[in-house]
Amino acid sequence: MATCLDSLGPLLGGAANSTDAANYICNRFTDTSSAVDATYLLFSAYLVFAMQLGFAMLCAGSVRAKNSMNIMLTNVLDAAAGALFYYLFGFAFAFGTPSKGFIGKQFFGLKHMPQTGYDYDFFLFQWAFAIAAAGITSGSIAERTRFSAYLIYSAFLTGFVYPVVSHWFWSTDGWASAGRLTGPLLFKSGVIDFAGSGVVHLVGGIAGLWGAFIEGPRIGRFDAAGRTVAMKGHSASLVVLGTFLLWFGWFGFNPGSFTTISKIYGESGTIDGQWSAVGRTAVTTSLAGSVAALTTLYGKRWLTGHWNVTDVCNGLLGGFAAITAGCSVVDPWASVICGFVSAWVLIGCNKLSLILKFDDPLEATQLHAGCGAWGIIFTALFARREYVELIYGVPGRPYGLFMGGGGRLLAAHIVQILVIVGWVSATMGTLFYVLHRFGLLRVSPATEMEGMDPTCHGGFGYVDEDEGERRVRAKSAAETARVEPRKSPEQAAAGQFV
């Protein structure tokens, strides 16, 4: 590809100082391109961070009213604690190079930042991803977990567990990263987990799986005979609001994972650039979620006989979780297949959870772990060669099995699923078990029955009227009683006042 200097040289005609002039102009273009890319990444980070509001609304609507304030507070805690611990340790473990492929060891407390390839905008973007994983887990253990346990697990997940996984698959020297610059690629391919079906969703889902399993189901979720007792969330409106906020944020989550937008593929002046890939990624994301929502709508109608908005919202999010790995390397038609299958994966996981008496109030484990795992496999089947080579910059890479690319990518992705499940189980499973053994994980039965809001947070999240309104109403009623003429039954019948 011709450089800026090569293109400008002939235009300047070899005039005096033409080289200096060309250098100046090219540097200005480079600065502008860097500014555009930084703005794009920051805007994407803001969108991903806005997903925390979506998580909060979705969680609040999916639990009972007596626990709504508790679950919203945990979402605030995930963001706040995650910011501190990802700043101190997490970013260093995730992207500190050089390393031996397992864990980073530079940038603790953002020391030596910024430098080439790692600026503050990149830290902000990655922090927003880290707290998304923690938010997934909080939904699985809702309505029965001590608030102190949230603080402990959130700090551990965002500061250590999640960063190690992201180093493996996203760092430039991670042992399984498709973008690895030093050392051999896993199966000569590396793992293509573009925006985190495995790194974010499978990690958060497996962590939630262990938390919910060790805690056990909520009181009353299953009766003495083992039959399921419905515990519906208190607000479908909040669920829908949260779902749309998450959909909006996913346009930063998936397309934003390019981290730049001004990169050119091929010769300058063509339409073949990263901006086109960004647009295609947004399309595949929307299609996968939309098809999953429609499939869930009619699938649940067929199974249960009614239309359920909460099921549709979860199906939509399941499609998003699945397409996240391969959103940049598959065609739009393939994303339709991804969404269709992800809906049935979610329905099947929900059926299995009831059989096993597994209680996840938000279906977070089924949605993020189940659909995330499917998304990893889907990418290994449908990744297109041209997109893989353009995005990862190396010709001859393995690509999707169904697209003629062989089985190397599929083998790498199976390894990804296995190591994530093993790592998160060993770390988060152990943490939840230790908290359980020391009585720090689950609230008392009395607290759970009464509700987390009145027992732990000073009152209910919803108040019909405040104390001042009650006093005004009582005073008005008393004054009315004093001035209103009273009638005896006989006088009332005769139309006379006392």
From Swiss-Prot:
Residues 473-498 are annotated as: Disordered. Induction: Down-regulated by ammonium or glutamine supply in roots. One of its GO terms (biological process) is ammonium transmembrane transport. Expressed in roots. It is a multi-pass membrane protein. SUPFAM superfamilies: Ammonium transporter. This is Ammonium transporter 1 member 3.
